Each structure stands twice: as C-alpha cells, then as structure tokens.
Regions:
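Class I S-adenosyl-L-methionine-dependent methyltransferase catalytic core
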Residues: 1-218
Length: 218
C-alpha cells in the first residue's frame, strides 16, 4: 500500500528558520561528531542487514561524518547533498529539490530541525520517497503523536534511543557549550501496511466561543 502523494514542500533554503532551540543558528551549521556518526551507522548496519549491498543517502552532509562512516562500514554507494557542503564527498544541493537516483535506500542523517520541525519533517518525507529505512537524529518532540501524524504513513518506528549530542564546528572542535540538545535517534522501516493516524477524542473540556461568553481567556 502506498500513501497518496503529499503536497509539495518548500525548499530547505526557502523555509524561514527562527531561533527555537540552542541548535538553531542561521542555517543550523552545527555538525555531528565523527565518533557518534560511526556508532549510529554501525547500529543501522546491524539493524538492516546486507549493508554492503545498500545505497546510503545523507541529505544534510555537512562535514561528511556520516558519509565517511557509511563508506568505512562498506556501503555499496553513498549519496549526499548539503546547501553548504563542507566535505569533498558532499554535493551542493537542496535535498528537498534534487533528484535522488536511488531505490530502497537507507537514509541516515542529523537533519536541520527548524522551528516546530519545519525542516526535519519535510526531510523525512522526502527521504521516504526513495528509502526502505530512515535513521534520523531528531528532537524528542518527534515522540509526540502530533509530529508522527505528519510523517509518511508507510514508515513504522522500530527503535527509538535517547541521545545527547555535543555538537562540533566545521573544524571538528567542540562548539559552544550551550548547544547541547536533548535529542533521540529514531529508526524507521517502510512496510506495506500503513501506520494508523493517532486521533485524540474531543472531551469537550475546552470550547471555542466569543469573548462575551468565555469563562476564561488564555
């Protein structure tokens, strides 16, 4: 079963990113430390099997930590783009707009989050078009049904681990201490059965009304 096509999303460069957490600075140029990238790639390889025959996609390549880790782990092919690449194996491009010559790939990334996940969710849904597995470092708000309801329904969450990252700068040095962000790494798998949308029953506790009839204002 394939979910109907979703409406087009804005490009990564077109989405206005507002400061919402300590990771968001301009174009969110904090990078995943290489040892952490290697650890997560190893986890993915163990989870999916046949890693040596797989194509790996890194949609926010940056300094190439995931690219190098995937290559060392033996991936058959690694494709990566970034709007401001900092590594020779990362191509210049907007992931939300570039063509992806892959099928049943594995997408591994620490994508840009954006305010209220305005970037991370479009990145996931774009990756879902060509992937069998997706492993993303994301805010822990991704555990909420309100976020997961916006993700491609063909994908099912198979693992979710807490993660606290000390981000690094373009030179691999520790970035500002305030950038520590409570995140998680989620592993998603494409399945033929659609994931159900979570619906919350309206208990009628709060109702929209006019100012004249309201009991309280928020």
């Amino acid at each position: 079963v394939t979910k109907p096509a979703t409406k087009p999303t804005k490009s990564a460069t077109a989405v206005k990113v507002r400061a919402g957490n300590t990771r968001v600075t301009g174009k969110e140029q904090y990078y995943t430390p290489a040892p952490l990238a290697a650890k997560l790639v190893a986890e993915v390889a163990a989870l999916v099997g046949n890693f040596e025959s797989r194509t790996v996609i890194e949609p926010a390549g940056g300094t190439g930590s995931f690219v190098e880790a995937a290559e060392r782990a033996g991936a058959a092919r690694v494709l990566s783009v970034d709007i401001e690449p900092k590594h020779e194996r990362v191509n210049l491009g907007d992931f939300l707009e570039v063509e992806l010559p892959a099928h049943n790939a594995i997408t591994i990334s620490n994508p840009p989050f954006g305010r209220n996940n305005s970037l991370s969710i479009p990145f996931f849904n774009r990756a879902a078009e060509v992937s069998e597995y997706i492993a993303f470092i994301v805010p822990r708000s991704w555990r909420k049904w309100s976020v997961q309801n916006r993700l491609d329904q063909n994908f099912h969450l198979v693992r979710d681990d807490d993660l606290t990252i000390n981000y690094v700068d373009v030179n691999g040095q520790d970035a500002h201490a305030k950038n520590r962000l409570r995140t998680c790494v989620q592993y998603w798998e494409r399945k033929s059965k659609l994931r159900p949308i979570v619906k919350v029953k309206d208990m009628g506790i709060i109702e929209r009304t006019t100012p004249e009839l309201a009991d309280a204002a928020m």
